[in-house]
């Protein structure tokens, strides 16, 4: 029997606000444990939360960018459960009236071809929990409350995703939208973007969904892909063995490529939601929403379309450049300097991405002057330096943020522009390679390429290849 996979994702993103959602504590990542904590986010009796207005703005911005309807009258609710990383024993979230509803993101339909819409059921604001630390002590678990109260958006999709590849593309597109809107850095390795993956399978032709399981807090694209494929296969094997899939929460172990049952899957009634009594409802005016709408940046899909029509870039080029807002900023500044969008794109997709990959650096963590790449391209295209030298200059810019012109001068990388000097070197090379010269004159075309290579080596790559070729042909006749 053949089966269809059905997936829905709950994507959690930490917002790039300076302070937490209900207090003034810092949201900075990586501080000393429990150094960004106050009475409010620690849940001390008698404290009262106050909503961070920037969180509301970012939620509306995200909703508009994902085609959602903004709920003019929305409110917070309490989600009640006990866990050591939740000091109040409840989480302030939104259940009944979330701030954004009924949106969508378009992705590639991997099953039927073309494109499809993954519907977004809702986007709601909530506070993050703390973090349990298990690996520093052998006899106890520690709790770091720095993350407690950091503002989150939870983006809940409908079960419209039919395979692992679609799930990854959906999260990639969400990440790009969030980054372009400036609401989150989406650094998955720091936990600022993570996904809860809901998976079920159903026989082809069936009309009812199968029993779903959930795998929580998956924080890489590879893990999302592998978790979905593994869980779908596990459920198929359970069904074909004559058993029933259990509705449960499972933990994905990416290192082992498998998941483990944690607990039975909870429903909303298990959390005993009720309206948050310490926070008033939020009422948003049409003017407020329209102001945010007008301030939206050019979003990834619109930017891709413009790059293709205005610059003649390919689908592949635009997908790569628009995969990170950092690439986009570098690309647009480089085009502004060089006036050459195709060279700018190829340098970013080639040398810049190679340097990032080799150094295991994220695009968001690039620290060199964005004007430098444009200047390097100008130097190479103006025959001031060779392609190989340009790569070396970029590597120095990447690691040490050097000035390209100063680096070229200090390392004597300037191209030889004196045709007389080039001719002298070519003549010397020909005198040293009489056999190759005679073979070329005897009709062996490959010897010409050999001689060019010898000339470029003698010139240490510091002469334009076209000029060397021209002089070589003139001498050989």
Please place each PLM-identified region on the residue numbering.
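Amphipathic alpha-helical core segments of compact helical bundles
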Residues: 16, 198, 233, 349-357, ...
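Strongly charged, low-complexity linkers/loops
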Residues: 364-374, 378, 384-457
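Residue-level detector of well-ordered alpha-helical segments, enriched
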Residues: 317, 330, 340-348, 372, ...
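C-terminal non-catalytic interaction appendages of large macromolecular assemblies
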Residues: 145-150, 188-195, 204-207, 414-477
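Basic, nucleic-acid-interacting segments
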Residues: 1-298, 315, 336-340, 354
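M16/insulysin-pitrilysin zinc metalloprotease superfamily fold
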Residues: 337-338, 344, 352-366, 375-380, ...
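Structural motif
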Residues: 1, 312, 335-344, 382-385, ...
